[in-house]
């Protein structure tokens, strides 16, 4: 078992591994311990993942190193964990987008110093003008006096 495969197993509960194994085994018709790359998308969708054709091609290219056209269960686990992490990343970005919309009170696509101060006041935090200025300086990478969504995402990376 490679380090990558051991890490994938450590990320999953025994229950999840058993669920993945059951799905994997359904497509391992001959019981040989591997499935064809063609069946991979079907198995992933059955397990609640939604890879695009491009994502599936990229995943398969990474996993099927020997070009055999088959993927064993350990390779499958590594791939599923990768896909789960990608899905989680997408969800957290959606949540951050919702936060940004709430913070952007005037809906102009930016958080300005007044809106930032209002966020803290609404949460009961007392912040000084200097603290707001410092936060703006940290988040406002292009120095236009306001924080756009990309700057907000970068700012929030350190918080999560």
Curated annotation (Swiss-Prot):
Mind telling me which Pfam families this protein's record contains?
A: EF-hand_7
Q: Which residues bind Ca(2+) 3?
A: 104, 106, 108, 110, 115
* N-acetylthreonine, modified sites: 2
Which SUPFAM superfamilies does the UniProt entry name for this protein? EF-hand
Give the domain of life. Answer: Eukaryota
- Binding positions for Ca(2+) 2 per the UniProt entry: 64, 66, 68, 70, 75
* Entry-linked SMART domains: EFh
Q: Which InterPro entries match?
A: CALM/Myosin/TropC-like, EF-hand-dom_pair, EF_Hand_1_Ca_BS, EF_hand_dom
UniProt entry tagged with the keyword Lipoprotein: no
Q: Which GO terms describe its biological process?
A: regulation of muscle contraction; skeletal muscle contraction
Q: Quote the record's binding site residues for Ca(2+) 4.
A: 140, 142, 144, 146, 151
Residues binding Ca(2+) 1: 28, 30, 34, 39
> Which controlled-vocabulary keywords does the entry list?
Acetylation, Calcium, Disease variant, Metal-binding, Muscle protein, Repeat
Where in the numbering of this chain does the EF-hand domain appear?
Answer: 15-50, 51-86, 91-126, 127-160
A cellular component term from Gene Ontology for this protein is: troponin complex
Matching entries from PANTHER family are given as: MYOSIN LIGHT CHAIN 1, 3, TROPONIN C2, FAST SKELETAL TYPE
Leftover remarks: Skeletal muscle troponin C binds four calcium ions.
The condition associated with this protein in its record is:
Congenital myopathy 15: An autosomal dominant myopathy characterized by neonatal onset of hypotonia, muscle weakness, and respiratory muscle involvement resulting in severe respiratory insufficiency. The disorder improves over time, although forced vital capacity remains decreased. Other features include facial weakness, often with ptosis or external ophthalmoplegia, jaw or distal joint contractures, scoliosis, and osteopenia.
What is the recorded name of this protein? Troponin C, skeletal muscle
- Species, as recorded: Homo sapiens
């Amino acid at each position: 078992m490679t380090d990558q495969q051991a890490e994938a197993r450590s990320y999953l509960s025994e229950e999840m591994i058993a669920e993945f194994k059951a799905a994997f085994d359904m497509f391992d018709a001959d019981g040989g311990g591997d499935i064809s790359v063609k069946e991979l998308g079907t198995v992933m969708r059955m397990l609640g993942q939604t890879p695009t054709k491009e994502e599936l091609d990229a995943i398969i290219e990474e996993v099927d190193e020997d070009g055999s056209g088959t993927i064993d269960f350990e390779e499958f686990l590594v791939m599923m964990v990768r896909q789960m992490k990608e899905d989680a990343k997408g969800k957290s970005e959606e949540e951050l987008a919702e936060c940004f919309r709430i913070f952007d009170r005037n809906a102009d696509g930016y958080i300005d110093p007044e809106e930032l101060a209002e966020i803290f006041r609404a949460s009961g935090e007392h912040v000084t003008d200097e603290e707001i200025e410092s936060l703006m300086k940290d988040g406002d990478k292009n120095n236009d006096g306001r924080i756009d969504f990309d700057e907000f995402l970068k700012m929030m990376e350190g918080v999560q």
